[in-house]
């Protein structure tokens, strides 16, 4: 399992320093004193493990990643290029990557368009186009695109036909996603839908294949094993293979 960071999520509040530097220093000195006493009691090495987590916590709230959330440190022209809403989240994601974050997730809801899809897409579409284009261009200009993989995906596709309410319902057999950067071969469309836009026309590309492609970019062994909740060994990715057109 992984714990992606959502730049617009609740965890952001826990990363902000709520006291001044002097009070933080005083608290840290008190904690060091308590830890010294605890080490005298505990000789089994448990405290050494806790120390590393405490240090990570201090590093998190004091590191330059904090500035990643404050767009006043960004060039106003860049902020304007990204736009509001999703654009602000995309920009914070880029700044987090620059600050050392290895995995950032942005959740952008509002796509469950069972009715009124035309009006909803007229609002949603341009915002996504602007933010995504700005991020890709920005990463490229900063020399970060080759080492950063952008994955844009939903949970599933939508029905090929418009329903009676002017919307589209859930549709699992076919979906569309986009990838950019990460050293993959860009500028192409992979896969094709059948005539009725309901199933893949040629070979299907599965979620496991997508994960295998991401693992390839990250140079992770997709065949690594772990023990599942039933206590049985299983592969991280059971059947997926990297998408050959991209790697």
Over which residues does each language-model region extend?
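Ligand-binding pockets and gating/stacking loops
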Residues: 1-247
């Amino acid at each position: 399992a992984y714990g992606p960071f959502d730049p617009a999520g609740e965890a952001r509040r826990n990363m902000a320093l709520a006291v001044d530097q002097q009070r933080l220093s005083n608290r840290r000195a008190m904690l060091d004193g308590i830890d010294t006493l605890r080490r005298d009691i505990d000789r089994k090495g448990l405290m050494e493990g806790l120390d590393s987590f405490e240090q990570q916590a201090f590093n998190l709230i004091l590191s330059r990643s904090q500035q990643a959330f404050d767009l006043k440190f960004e060039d106003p022209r860049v902020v304007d290029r990204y736009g509001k809403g999703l654009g602000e989240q995309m920009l914070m994601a880029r700044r987090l990557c620059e600050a050392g974050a290895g995995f950032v997730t942005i959740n952008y809801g509002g796509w469950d368009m069972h009715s009124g899809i035309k009006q909803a897409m007229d609002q949603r579409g341009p915002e996504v186009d602007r933010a995504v284009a700005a991020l890709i261009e920005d990463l490229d200009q900063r020399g970060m695109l080759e080492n950063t993989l952008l994955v844009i995906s939903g949970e599933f596709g939508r029905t090929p036909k418009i329903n009676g309410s002017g919307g589209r319902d859930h549709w699992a057999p076919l979906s569309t996603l986009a990838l950019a950067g990460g050293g993959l071969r860009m500028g192409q469309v992979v896969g094709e839908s059948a005539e009725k836009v309901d199933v893949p026309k040629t070979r299907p590309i599965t979620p496991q294949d997508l994960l295998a492609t991401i693992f390839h970019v990250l140079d992770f062994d997709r065949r690594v094993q772990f023990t599942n909740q039933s206590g049985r060994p299983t592969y991280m990715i059971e059947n997926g293979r990297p998408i050959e057109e991209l790697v």
